[in-house]
């Protein structure tokens, strides 16, 4: 419980440091208790980011959420599907939220691969490139692999360092926050905020298990193998 409260405090500071609450207030007024809480949390903080004043409020909000990392990006994307919680106008504005974050280093990528696959399998990977795409959960590298003596071009998707631990700590703290909101602001109970956060946790944890994505690609390849014009990347399960 104390750990969750501490994580919630850190998230609150992160939110308070951004422009999220000010931007949200232009769409929907938050409860007074929330405004007071964020005012307290923002004590001694200076704004860490300068947002272009010439862009829309939705673009500003998307940029703020992106700056706060994976958990808030996923939360924003999920809330787009719940206009009953955030309102039609805000849901429409958040459609522009992009699932992008700065890439982590090639050195970190190699360290993760070696730890997960072992030295022998790692040595079968040749010419691992710098990241070619980076999102909130994982990033992609081009590479060549030695598959039983045959050199093949592949793309390797690697989860961000400590992403599962970080996300689950933050989402559990947000679930605690949802519990507080439902307990003290009675009219929010109809929104089932705890269920919303729990569902987001389940969906994102499934997304972080790349075996499901690989299995889906395999199934799609099998279903379209006789269809002209379809080419599905092969999954190398031995890696």
What do the PLM-derived regions correspond to, one by one?
Residues 177-186, 203-228:
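Structural motif at the C-terminus of the N-lobe alphaC helix and the adjacent alphaC-beta4 loop
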Residues 1-139, 165-193, 197, 204:
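N-terminal accessory/targeting segments that precede structured cores
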Residues 139-147:
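Conserved ATP phosphate-binding architecture of protein kinases
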Residues 142, 152-159:
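Glycine-rich ATP phosphate-binding loop
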Residues 76, 140, 156, 213:
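Residue-level signature of catalytic and energy-coupling elements of molecular machines
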Residues 189, 225-236:
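Conserved HxN/HPN-centered segment at the entrance to the catalytic loop
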Residues 152, 162-167:
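Conserved ATP-binding/catalytic core of the eukaryotic-like protein kinase fold
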